[in-house]
Amino acid sequence: GLASRNSALPTTAMATMMSTPVKLDYLVVGFLSFEGIIQDLADITSLEIHEEMGLAEVTLARPFTPPTRRVFTSGCSGGITFSLALQPYPPILSEELLRPEQVYPLMRQLFEACTLYMATRGVHGAALSDGEKLLIAAEDVGRHNALDKIMGEALLKEIPTRGRILLSTGRISSEMLRKGAHMGTPFIISRTSPTSLAIEGAKQLGITLI
């Protein structure tokens, strides 16, 4: 579970997520970023992970009221979001190029980095790349969570995401596309076909789906 608080208000339950219990700090920070709850790390006063309780407790620098409407995203692990809107994100104007011969080597690197995925096929993997090598890789039972971990690690390690390439073993749905738009990635590569909503959204956002 994820709970938030600030110095003036009591603890508030924010969300309950199913997750592979590794890199939970990255998961929480990425989730908060994608949902627009934080803009940068300065918005987090403290973060405590209580693994034995399955709880992450975040102290925010400013008051936050959780939306009453929660949307459960597509996928077998049932991700959660407070918004599915693409409108906040302007089209990505990028001069970055991706050659066809780069795609397969990058996917091979993703598979090599995702050892649990290769061993079990029971989790999803995701990665951020500069076109030649992987900068970050993460695995989770949920494909949405894997992207949250990528975003969280990028923020905590100050690794730029804009203009990079996002890779995933999972299907690119409209919710996954929204996360790519948030990161500013002009290319999203997946081993599975995207949904029709993702294709339409990608046209609006200037994102190439492969």
What is the predicted role of each segment?
Residues 111-169:
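A mid-sequence, solvent-exposed acidic-amphipathic segment
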Residues 1-129, 136-137:
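Intrinsically disordered, low-complexity regions enriched in acidic/Ser/Thr/Pro/Gln residues
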Residues 28-32, 42, 70-73, 141, ...:
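Surface-exposed beta-strand edges and their flanking turn/coil or helix-capping segments
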Residues 49, 124-127, 131, 171, ...:
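Short, surface-exposed, charged/polar-biased interaction segments
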Residues 144-210:
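Feature captures the catalytic cores and cofactor-binding loops of soluble hydro-lyases/lyases
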Residues 19, 138-142, 194:
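Short alpha-helix boundary/capping segments
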